[in-house]
From Swiss-Prot:
Keywords, in A-Z order: RNA-binding, Transcription, Transcription antitermination, Transcription regulation
Gene that encodes it: nusB
Coiled coil residues, start to end: none
Acidic residues bias: start-end ranges: 172-188
Region (Disordered): 154-188
GO cellular component: cytosol
Name of the protein this chain belongs to: Transcription antitermination protein NusB
């Protein structure tokens, strides 16, 4: 390999779709809007006569729609498997987005090998987040990967994952969260 290509990694269409899905989930949480609405806006803008944004890949749309539909289950399972010293809500938004994309792929997309979902998530986190993000994202997803069949079964059964303590999506205005001083929180 030539010297100029050392360190160069090829990234296929799915990697780019995952990365765009992370961008959109991050934006949705930051702006407090529905990520599916962002997809719709991007599709409209990309279909204009003089497009101002790149077209949305089908796989990006599948990820966003899947995460939006399964968000409560995904967040419940992530909360169960994240390190005891962390709360999902307290992680940086970009890390939550990366974890949600990878979790959706692991549980709901049998076409993606679990190892691929984990490796790609760690790589995206290393590009977008802090130096330490890759390690705890890898640990969380490896923990989930070790029992992926059980988790897929739980995810397929709506009653198998507790929904009562599930965090409300930032774009879901149907429920009001308690004020910060009213919320019970025993972990950092």
């Amino acid at each position: 390999m030539s010297e100029s290509r050392q360190g160069y990694k090829r990234h296929g269409a799915r990697y780019k779709a995952r990365r765009r899905a992370v961008d959109i989930l991050f934006e949705a949480e930051s702006r407090d809007v529905d990520p599916v609405a962002i997809i719709d806006d991007r599709k409209t803008l990309s279909n204009a006569v003089d497009p101002v944004v790149a077209p949305v890949a089908e796989y990006t749309e599948a990820i966003i729609n899947g995460v939006a539909v399964e968000l409560d289950t995904i967040d419940d399972l992530l909360s169960e498997h994240i390190a005891d010293t962390w709360l999902l809500e307290r992680l940086p938004s970009v890390d939550r987005a990366v974890l949600r994309v990878a979790c959706w792929e692991m549980l709901y997309n049998p076409d993606v090998p679990v190892t691929t979902a984990v490796v790609e998530a760690v790589e995206i986190a290393s590009q977008y987040s802090t130096d330490k993000a890759g390690a705890y994202i890898n640990a969380t997803l490896d923990n989930m990967a070790s029992k992926v069949d059980e988790l897929r079964e739980r995810a397929a059964n709506p009653g198998a994952v507790s929904g009562s303590d599930a965090p409300v999506a930032p774009w879901d205005d149907s429920e009001e969260l308690p004020a910060e001083d009213e919320a019970e929180d025993s972990r950092p």
